[in-house]
Amino acid sequence: EMARQAARESIVLLENKDNILPLSKDMRTIAVLGPGADDLQPGDYTPKLQPGQLKSVLTGIKQAVGKQTKVIYEQGCDFTSLGENNIAKAVKVASQSDVVLLVLGDCSTSEATTDVYKTSGENHDYATLILPGKQQELLEAVCATGKPVILILQAGRPYNLSKASELCKAILVNWLPGQEGGPATADVLFGDYNPAGRLPMTFPRHVGQLPLYYNFKTSGRRYEYSDMEYYPLYYFGYGLSYTSFEYSGLKIQEKENGNITVQATVKNIGQRAGDEVVQLYVTDMYASVKTRITELKDFTRIHLKPGEAKTVSFELTPYELSLLNDHMDRVVEKGAFKILVGGVSPQYVAKDRIKDSVGYADSKKGLSGMLEYTHEFAAD
């Protein structure tokens, strides 16, 4: 049960167009496709396990639905091969279904099985972010059937999901989910568990954006590309839910010892119970050296029933506001700090005075406030 709960809590919902998820367990036909659908992905350095200990996504789907639902499986292609494949068979199966669950991504099981070519893990870097092998071709061919496609990215790294975000009705990332990954994924797909995972990394639009991370330092120059959008596809800290939350009552107070207390109230304004990952970010507005656009300082995960509200409290220490000055001494400087609390990382407008734009579009995303910090601490 612990493995199943850990897998459920880590799943990140990236897209849910027209609220297609959660699915009904009474659907007539579900196609489960892709090289990861009936493959076991416990992750790197996994010891050999006993038969039956690991459950695939296909197994989880079959266990979740009723007897009246027909589940059809077709691999379509393997993880890496560019040669012979069964994409045509997968397309045929997809065209006969009510919904398609397409499981693509990585293979990282060489410690548990033999004769498997890994695509993720130690010593397996990739020069591209396109899905390996024929997986991208499989995705586009299946989506061309017109059937609603839900992409399950079972991976240990970000991939370029630009095309998938256009074509798929929903996208979720279940990573390399371990021995109970299949049932945990089914729990999210059918609404037995409300997803609340957040991205611990940034998903770029293109490999040309790398390195790409949320807490970059401002350059004082232009932030743009001539041939594509500057911003990432999915931001660090991003993730959707089957319910909605609203933030209010942000309070920021500087204490005599230099600590800062931050409070905000979070309310579930939707119709489903669910978790919210409340994230605390800080932006140092002006400093003696260049500082990062924003930085995650703390987070907490809370559970709220429909209509329920909770007040979340954080405490920042002076060290968490400190920087390395031009002498490489760690110091704390007084001045303006922007304090941000929300369910996702704050957004920004990539132009001059970029820090001024860091914030949230509305109270459903989060809140921000300014603090004129009065303490100064020099290096020991």
Where are these regions (language model features)?
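C-terminal non-catalytic regions of proteins with extracellular/luminal or membrane-system context
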Residues: 4-380
